[in-house]
A protein has these predicted regions:
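Structural motif
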Residues: 2, 64-65, 103
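N-terminal Rossmann NAD(P)H-binding glycine-rich loop of SDR-like oxidoreductase domains
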Residues: 1-25
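Conserved Rossmann-fold NAD(P)-dependent oxidoreductase catalytic core, especially the SDR/UDP-sugar
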Residues: 6, 11, 26-30, 34, ...
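Active-site-lining helix/loop region of Rossmann-like oxidoreductase modules
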Residues: 153-156, 160-215
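NAD(P)H-binding glycine-rich loop region in Rossmannoid oxidoreductase-like domains
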Residues: 29-91, 95-98, 113, 189-193, ...
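Active-site beta-alpha turn of Rossmann-fold NAD(P)-dependent dehydrogenases/reductases
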Residues: 70, 105-108, 149, 202
Length: 215
């Protein structure tokens, strides 16, 4: 299956590209600069120009599925967060609807429905992500929204905890590796039981395959 990845050049996005190729999919990396091809093409990706703050039809054309793994970054202010994590995500969703990329897996965030569960410094981010999530849920696409806790760069454990609300969040208790998150994003593509599901995830004791089957 041809799968376009928004945020392909990010730390999580690169892992997603590799895992898609390993699983037999055809990953399409949406990038803002063709210079990034040198690092992404060896991961098995076709690279296409696309910027979430501009029309992205070219990047999505011919793809049957999409994974949204983009983000404005933790060092940006509320305005950039709204431009990328909210408006950019919504425009990308609309493009997928228009171009019939019916399967959509969203990398969301823990605590977006209840920002008070997290630090006040992230409330603007939670609110922006919540708006984008609701837009996806109303889009008619076959969506899955994965809401991980704090992302780490450690090797994946292959085991997670999932739930609708995993309680007040802290880095010490609500973290998860990027590798495990990428695995969940990719595996959800072919799991029909995850369609129209929204769930939080952190590191845990349940093997990823078992956790996803139980959703």
């Amino acid at each position: 299956m041809k799968v376009v990845v928004a945020g392909a050049n990010g730390l999580t996005g690169r892992i997603v590209l590799r895992m898609l190729a390993e699983a037999g999919h055809q990953p399409v990396a949406m990038i803002r600069d063709f210079a990034q091809r040198e690092e992404l093409e060896p991961l098995g990706a076709e690279c296409r120009i696309g910027d979430l703050e501009k029309p992205v039809g070219y990047a999505v054309r011919g793809c049957r599925a999409a994974i949204f793994a983009a983000g404005s970054g933790s060092k940006t202010g509320p305005e950039k967060t709204i431009d990328v994590d909210q408006k950019g995500a919504m425009a990308f969703i609309d493009t997928c609807v228009r171009m019939n990329a019916r399967r959509f897996v969203m990398l969301g965030s823990i605590a977006v429905d209840k920002p008070e569960r997290g630090p006040e410094s992230l409330h603007h981010y939670f609110r922006a992500k919540a708006v984008a999530d609701r837009h996806l849920q109303a889009s008619g696409l076959n969506y899955t929204i994965v809401r991980p806790g704090f992302l780490t760069n450690e090797p994946g454990t292959g085991a997670i905890t999932t739930g609708d609300d995993l309680g007040p969040i802290a880095k010490e208790t609500h973290s998860v590796t990027r590798e495990d998150v990428a695995r969940v994003l990719v595996d959800c593509l072919n799991l029909d039981n995850t369609i129209e599901k929204t769930f939080e995830m952190i590191r845990g004791e349940t093997p990823i395959a078992d956790a996803l089957k139980a959703l």
